[in-house]
Amino acid sequence: MALPIDFITRTRALLGEEFERLEAALSADVPVSIRINPMKGTPAPKAGAPVAWCESGFYLPERLSFTFDPLFHAGAYYVQEASSMFLEQAIKAYVKEPVRCLDLCAAPGGKSTHLASLLPDGSLLVSNEVIRSRSYVLAENIAKWGHPDTIVINNDPEDIGEALPHLFDVIVTDVPCSGEGMFRKDTDSTGEWSVDNVRLCASRGRRIIHDIWNALKPGGILIYSTCTYNTEEDEENIHYIIEELGAEALPIPTQEEWQITGALRFEPVSYTH
């Protein structure tokens, strides 16, 4: 894989000696993982090792033709990167009773279907997607998952913040980003990457959080995530949320064998089934 020169320079400065591991992993085969729908009670594809931080997550020995699998279309499972399933640990750590939860940037539905399975009974999940065409895909996946008490909406974060002040106990914001975490899965994405786009995405992420902040209850939980590695979109935006919006960073418990440390950076690694 031909990585952008600026990406190599910036990421090598960030990771130091670990950059070689990242570079090798980006050229390795992409592990395939799925999350089982606990409500369906139907068999899923033959799974391999479990995803350590997700009770319903499993790696597959090989990628299947999911579009030809009726169980996939019936919502018996969802194909999702294992790193995205770490949302489960944040919810388990801090959500103990029924809540009103907003998944702000929800399409295509991976985190929303996971939230639907995780939230305590009696919770309300609102799944939002600002791009109308993507909201149709989101609605389809939510319907296939089949969980009640879930609403799909198509609104701008600013409108939600103004119309629904202090309504949500939990807001999940998997904000649009420069997609550095997509390089291994979509090699064409390397050609779309640039430092200018990183800066644009970082600014957009701050705006999204600023616009939605008013919808979060005082003392509520905001979960911020991206699928990228740079500090502008990650640590610097977290710093903005803390310093400018008055948030408090909360720890998420992890197990030593997960090899997740510090700022919870998920970097692609080679995986052997």
Enumerate the predicted regions with their spans.
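Glycine-rich nucleotide cofactor-binding entry segment
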Residues: M1-L167, V198-R204, E244, E248-F266
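Helix-to-beta-strand junctions that scaffold the AdoMet/dcAdoMet cofactor pocket
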Residues: P120, L216-K217
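Mobile active-site "lid"/loop adjacent to the S-adenosyl-L-methionine
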Residues: S133, V170-D211, C227-E235, P253
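Glycine-rich, phosphate-binding/catalytic loops in enzymes
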Residues: D156, D188-G191, Y240
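Conserved strand-to-helix beginnings and helix N-cap segments that scaffold or border functional pockets
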Residues: L164-P165, D234-I238
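Conserved beta-strand signature within the Rossmann-like core of class I S-adenosyl-L-methionine
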Residues: I221-S225
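Conserved small/polar residues in nucleotide/adenosyl-binding loops
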Residues: T272-H273
